[in-house]
Amino acid sequence: MKTVTIEDLKQFVFIENPVYAPDGKSLAFIKATVDEKNNGYHRDLYLVKDGMVRQYTAKENTSFVLWNDETEMIISRKAETPGTTELLKLSVDGGEAIPWMALPFPLVKLHKLDNGNYVVIGSVKADEPDAWKVKAQKKEEDQSSCTVVDELPYWMTGSGYINKDRNCLFVIRDGTVDRITGADWNVDETVVDGNRMYYTCSKKDPSICLYQKLYCYDGNTGEISCIYDAWTHSIQNLYIVNGTLYFQASDMREYGVNETGKICTIKNGTIVTVCKPDRSMYNSVASDIALGGGKQRAVMDGALYSLETDEDHTMIVRYDEDGKKTIIKDAEETLFCMDAADHRIAYVSSSPSSLQELFELDVNTGEVTKLTDFNGAYVQDTTISIPERVDYESEGKSLHGWVIKPVGYEKGKKYPCVLDVHGGPRTVYGSSFFHEMQVWAAEGYFVCFTNIKGSDGRGDAFADIRGDYGGEDYRDLMIFMDRVLETYPDIDENRLCETGGSYGGFMTNWIITHTDRFCCAASQRSIASWISFSLIADIGPEFGTDQCGAKKSWDDATFDKLWHHSPLKYIRNAHTPTLFIHSDQDYRCPLSEGMQMMQGLAVQGVETRLCIFHGENHELSRSGKPANRIRRLREITDWFEQHTKA
């Protein structure tokens, strides 16, 4: 059998966005594969019907948009003109897709009302809200070489400059498109109930607003009414059960911007709490084998079915109208997305020994049916090293992590080891297949990873490390590393490597400025200074001060607190050879963060290297261009090789 290699990325199949037809008898989804020739990804539409999986498009980069009815789908494909959207109709009986609508703006979301009209969320410019009516060629001619920004956020990772960008509601009646909301506010979340659409709006000021108001659009009368008119809550995840609107709402007073929203409803203009979930109602398990997304929740049989992250894996749970929670599925898996209809739940899953596949769960019987086997041949022909659980105690907490042994491990032989730190910090590692870790195991490394204080999966209190970045979280990691060395004596403690991205990149920078126990490190999309991060990153002004426990007064105390938690403050203590990986379009953890750390090491004579990936953003390791993903992993692996096997 072969071992896992960096180039194996080209063989992986990714599954996205499973959606049932209105009658629940057909299931559409997207299959994505690497397009090596064009350094991108092919996305094609597939359908599961009568137990058969059938391909409906071929190499067209199709995105599934909406079931028009049980016999017809509306899909989109890449339009020839930038900034526009081409929509087509495709019958479940097959045949060519028929052009339906050409929208002169980027499509964000499409809904169908019971009266046959459609409501579209589209992106426009606030200072030119009707510029979409002008031909694209004319708009391109008007583009200036100067970008002006006068609001926050003015850029967003994955989107670029977004100054004055607004998501507005449009209605499609008899083939005519009309804008129905103003461009001063931004439409965020939506849900349809018959001929009504509920949606949230956030205001755009020179500063960032984290709160939303709640509105209702009546598709019959065209009237818009505000049903919650106070800037007091972050309102997300709208859904309808038996004609009643529910949503998650948080005032962020107890646990800050990462606080889990309560399930609520509206009564007489007041937010009423139904229940407080004890876990995040989405999948937050880190992965590098998932390309796109899909639904995290769906309504069926008068209840909400949702993904939830529990410690180190994803569950499916049910919330009744009164807030009662029932666990529907709980196994050692990562569930990426789901949909529900007709007593069945379709979901995309991976496990310690498998990549993504599509499954269907019968809620009545508990029977699980595997619908696809796209990655089966790869798994069957490849040696995969299964993670072994390691339990440990740290400052009164019972924690656990995992160790992956080197492929071909021989007891008594000494091996190097890689400590891998997840991002977030409010995400988790699980035991499911992780490409980069399997590559390092195949290259002869032990690989260890864990969920420290600040991770998701255990509720808000455990996830809360505001004002203590580099404190208890760092100590947990070092105690875990001690436990791993104690449990696996064949690890050479003189050949320990460390890496991590985003929060894991922050932690890498913190580690190299606080200990010399690692022979080398690879810091990815990292944070060097909470001051520069807070004043440059897309989410910086709110996230930086919140996470560091600093006031937004921007006085000396604010800067002192931000600087206290900044790895750059301690750069004089760093001696570890460190590689930095950054993308020049990453506005979440900007390139300037890696540059500061790299230069700080270089001027002190510490061995360092910075790799800048052009045209990539914060998602390089997960959905970047295939060639760049391969180059990134090769750079890190070569850096480890250089410092452990020379």
Sequence positions of predicted segments:
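A short beta-strand motif characteristic of beta-propeller blades
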Residues: 4-10, 53-56, 96-101, 177-181, ...
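Short, solvent-exposed loop/turn segments at conserved positions within beta-propeller repeat blades
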Residues: 37-42, 80-85, 160-166, 206-212, ...
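Predominantly five- to eight-bladed beta-propeller fold
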Residues: 43, 124-170, 213, 261-264, ...
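A short loop-to-beta-strand structural motif that recurs across blades of beta-propeller domains
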Residues: 44-46, 86-88, 168-170, 213-215, ...
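Short loop/turn segments that connect beta-strands within beta-propeller blades
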Residues: 49-51, 91-95, 173-176, 218-222, ...
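Cap/lid segment of the alpha/beta-hydrolase catalytic domain
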Residues: 374-494, 501
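Active-site-proximal cap/loop segments of hydrolase catalytic domains
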Residues: 452-646
